[in-house]
A protein has these predicted regions:
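Helix-breaking motifs and short loop linkers at transmembrane-helix boundaries and internal kinks
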Residues: 39, 71, 92-98, 109, ...
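Conserved MFS/SLC helix-loop-helix module at the cytosolic interface between two early adjacent transmembrane helices
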Residues: 58-94
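Paired small-residue
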Residues: 82-89, 97-105, 294-302
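Helix-loop-helix hairpin linking two adjacent transmembrane segments in secondary transporters
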Residues: 98, 127-181, 226, 230
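Cytoplasmic helix-loop-helix junction between adjacent transmembrane helices
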Residues: 102-140
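A late C-terminal transmembrane helix in Major Facilitator Superfamily
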Residues: 321-358, 365
Length: 391
């Protein structure tokens, strides 16, 4: 059984996942205000988001290698402290470039945080609760999508966008104190150097999961990056129903993470079959479902559930197939690859919208989702079953 202290630590880590992802999403809802304040275009203000993702992608691995020898509780506290400092810098930024610098600092903290939070959550709980720990971390991300961005936007609209960053910084500081008090020391599992990377990549199944992490993220964000204009222009939903649909989308992600904790360990192969086929099916049927408000809302609900479930599967198998001393580094590689997939998916979706039609974004994503499903079934699943027999 889980002790109260385990639960309290896990809830604290889930809240940390919520606040880090809220911070990542926040500028999306504040771009117009930021652009107006600094007398720039929204496109220029949008570079804050693009550069943030690029920094996370580029620095996840090298930063994690540098800090891999540190005790994990102390490392987490330091990362949140840096996060708080740069949030406060965002709140007092007097120029576009000062804000950009502060967001780069937040991105560096983000890169390390997402490399350690899942391994830390797994090590905080008893063995039988590992799936629950991972699902709760991803639930924090889903809740950020549902509530974090809207709350941040409301704060920004009423008392200024700077106050949004200030509130995030204050919340994170309180959370840092809480985690310092409640978390037990979690020793590092050894240093990791660049010389060990070739050995890590010789872990065949791990490399396969890195590959499909990229293809899943790319296929998903080919469609999801443009879901708002798709719902408006193709499905013909009104603004209030678009908001409702996106909230349902995120809320069903919580159900997906709970489904993982309940069913994945019982039959990981069938569960992964279901979520990968679900992603393919949702993308393939996106245009057809747009004929009716009810069908597109139901499709988005299923899409949110299966994608979130697939994300937890990828994180779980990245940890399961990594050497004990390299789990945090493996997660940093996963984070970088996933962010690359986000960038590629957004680019592909944009090209489809430009050269074909917005109604075709689902088909473009479905092609890659189908290739992912075939790769999983013909290669990865076979290797995992052979490995299970050998063990």
């Amino acid at each position: 059984m889980m002790q109260t202290k385990n639960w309290m630590a896990l809830v604290g880590l889930t809240c940390a996942a919520f606040i880090f992802n809220t911070s990542e999403f926040i500028p999306i809802g504040l771009l117009t205000d930021i652009a107006n304040d600094f007398l720039t275009t929204e496109a220029q203000a949008g570079m804050i988001i693009s550069i943030y993702a690029f920094v996370v992608m580029l620095l996840s691995l090298p930063l994690m290698i540098v800090v891999s020898r540190f005790e994990m509780k102390k490392l987490l506290s330091s990362v949140i402290f840096v996060f708080v400092g740069f949030q406060l810098l965002s709140a007092v930024s007097t120029s576009y470039y000062m804000l950009m610098l502060s967001r780069i600092g937040v991105a560096c903290a983000h890169a390390i945080f997402w490399s350690i939070v899942s391994p830390l959550a797994v090590r905080t709980v008893p063995e039988k609760y590992k799936s629950l720990a991972l699902s709760m971390i991803v639930t924090g991300t889903s809740v950020a999508m549902i509530f974090g961005l809207p709350i941040g936007r409301v704060i920004g609209l009423h008392i200024g966008w700077r106050m949004t960053f200030l509130c995030i910084g204050i919340f994170a500081f309180v959370l840092m104190i809480y985690l310092m008090l409640i978390l037990s020391k979690v020793p590092s599992r050894g240093t990791f150097s660049l010389q060990k990377l070739p050995f890590l990549f010789r872990k065949s199944v791990l490399l396969d999961f890195f590959i499909i992490s990229f293809t899943i993220a790319t296929s998903y964000y080919t469609g999801y990056s443009y879901i708002e204009p798709f719902l408006k222009q193709v499905a013909g939903l009104q603004d209030n129903w678009i908001t409702v649909t996106l909230v349902i989308f995120g809320a069903m992600g919580i159900l997906g993470s709970l489904a993982f904790s309940r069913f994945y360990n019982k039959n990981p192969y069938k569960f992964t079959d279901f979520v990968l086929l679900g992603i393919f099916g949702c993308l393939m049927l996106l245009q057809a479902a747009a004929c009716c408000s009810l069908t597109i809302i139901l499709l988005c609900a299923l899409w949110g559930m299966v994608f979130t479930a697939s994300n937890v599967v990828l994180q779980a198998e990245t940890i399961n197939n990594s050497p004990i001393e390299a789990t945090a580094v493996s997660m940093s590689i996963f984070s970088g690859i996933f962010n690359l997939g986000i960038a590629c998916g957004t680019y592909i979706g944009g090209q489809v919208c430009t050269h074909f039609s917005m109604s075709d974004i689902g088909y473009a994503g479905a092609v890659l989702a189908f290739i992912t499903f075939i790769y999983w079934n013909k290669i990865i699943k076979k290797k995992m079953k052979e490995k299970a027999v050998c063990c």
